[in-house]
A protein has these predicted regions:
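Boundary/entry segment of secreted carbohydrate-active catalytic domains
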Residues: 27-48, 263, 325
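Active-site-adjacent "subsite" loops/lids of carbohydrate-active enzymes
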Residues: 31-33, 43, 113, 118-183
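Aromatic- and glycine-enriched glycan-recognition loops and surfaces
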Residues: 43-58, 85-107, 237-244
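Catalytic domains of carbohydrate-active enzymes, especially glycoside hydrolases
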Residues: 48-73, 183-184, 286-289, 347
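Aromatic-lined carbohydrate-binding/catalytic grooves of carbohydrate-active enzymes
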Residues: 61-94
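Aromatic- and acidic-residue-enriched segments that line the glycan-binding/catalytic groove
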Residues: 77-88, 119-154, 193-224
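Glycoside hydrolase catalytic-domain groove-lining segments
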Residues: 210-329
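Substrate-binding cleft of secreted/luminal carbohydrate-active enzymes
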Residues: 286-302, 309, 316-385
Length: 385
């Protein structure tokens, strides 16, 4: 190579690298303005699923976040994880995700499959034998363990977590997302609980030998207690690695599918408490949009936290999560929606479906408030349709 050709060729290589980097991190169009979460407790039958999608479409929502994984069990026909306990771990005779996709497509709204990422089981008792076997029974080493090698204990009404520091756990969660986008015409995958869980923070999980070996190899630090900053950073990086592996798996299966995440209400709490560095995920192009869970009754605090989220998002798409279920006065919900949009959020998402309509597991109580919310809140959706 002569000096005269060396510079142009190097310049060409530099241009290619810049284009590749920009292509990985550029913000994609996220066509979401009015979204709503439908939880796994909002439906029990095929009729329930049809009614859910029918209601949200008629109300003017353009996007539904439809929960299909709760805690190592699922609400679709999977070859990887067993049916959910809500269906007695057996095929209920219909596929909720298939029905939801069909109904959403016919009504012109986008459906994102919502999964709880790290929860591995929920409740005070172990799961029964299932096919495929549930992780708690089949893969005890996948769960968080303390320094005495005791697995995170089961507890009433909350989750025990899979260990996101283990490569095999990250691979499994990514495979679930890949299975969904390969089998179903979803518009995207919506991640929840993509973090260390609040319960167990004081135990400083994980302390199992495999996790500590990985920490030592990757940081050249042998003792987390002697290097607390490196320990925190490494665990945060493992959550980011999980998001990256999910992104790669989804892209391999369906390049058009969006990847979004329900994230902690402020970046600082997310970063420091549950090791969820979601502003970094946005900047790296690992996710397409965030839904900060800004569930609050207080308007001033809501506004302050929305501003914090937007500042750290740096122009990337933010859909503000509104805790509609907390508001006995629909005026609070409307005010929060108005504030979020005025401050610069691309849109909002309501938590949750059962705030507006009687849902599968809910009783009839609260019918008057649900009706009032439908009358007062939902009409503002329609101009955007």
């Amino acid at each position: 190579m002569t000096p005269s050709t060396q510079i142009p060729n190097r310049f060409k290589l530099l241009c290619v690298l810049v284009l590749l980097i920009c292509g990985c991190t550029a913000s994609r169009d996220v066509p979401i303005r009015n979204a709503i979460w439908i939880t796994r407790w909002d439906y029990l039958s095929e009729v329930d699923v049809v009614k859910c999608i029918e209601n949200v479409a008629a109300a003017g929502f353009d996007t539904v976040l439809f929960q299909v994984r709760g805690n190592g069990t699922v609400f679709y026909r999977s070859e990887i994880e067993p049916w959910a306990e809500e269906f007695q771990h057996a095929d209920p005779g219909f596929d909720p995700l298939e029905v939801a996709c069909r109904e959403a497509t016919s009504r012109g709204i986008a459906l994102h499959a919502w999964i709880n990422a790290v929860p591995g089981w929920r409740g005070a008792t172990a799961p029964p034998d299932t096919v495929p076997p549930q992780h708690w029974n089949a893969r005890p080493g996948w769960f968080l363990h303390d320094a005495q090698l005791k697995r995170q204990p089961l507890q009433p009404n909350y989750y025990v977590a899979l260990n996101p520091c283990l490569p095999q756990v990250r691979e499994h969660i990514a495979a679930i997302c890949s299975e969904i986008v390969e089998k179903y015409p979803v518009a995207g995958i919506h991640l929840d609980y993509i973090r260390f869980l609040e319960s167990g923070i004081e135990t400083d999980y994980p302390r199992d030998p495999e996790s500590l070996k990985l920490f030592s190899e990757q940081t050249h630090q042998s003792d987390p207690d002697a290097a607390p900053e490196a320990w925190e950073r490494w665990r945060r990086d493992q959550i980011t690695a999980l998001v990256r592996e999910i992104r790669q798996a989804v892209r391999r299966s369906d390049r058009d599918a969006l990847l979004t995440a329900a994230v902690y209400r402020t970046p600082l709490i997310a970063h420091d408490r549950v090791r969820q560095d979601w502003p970094r995920w946005l900047r790296l192009g690992l996710i397409d949009a965030v839904f900060p869970m800004q569930y609050d009754r207080e308007i001033p605090r809501f506004e302050k936290r929305v501003r914090e989220c937007l500042r750290e998002a740096r122009g990337y798409p933010v859909l503000m999560g509104i805790g509609t279920y907390l508001h006995d006065d629909p005026a609070v919900t409307l005010r929060q929606r108005q504030l979020a949009l005025r401050l610069g959020c691309q849109g909002v998402s309501h938590f949750a479906y059962s705030s507006f309509w009687q849902a599968g597991h809910a009783g009839a109580s609260g019918a008057d408030l649900r009706l009032l919310r439908r009358q007062r809140i939902l009409p503002v959706n329609r101009p955007h349709r």
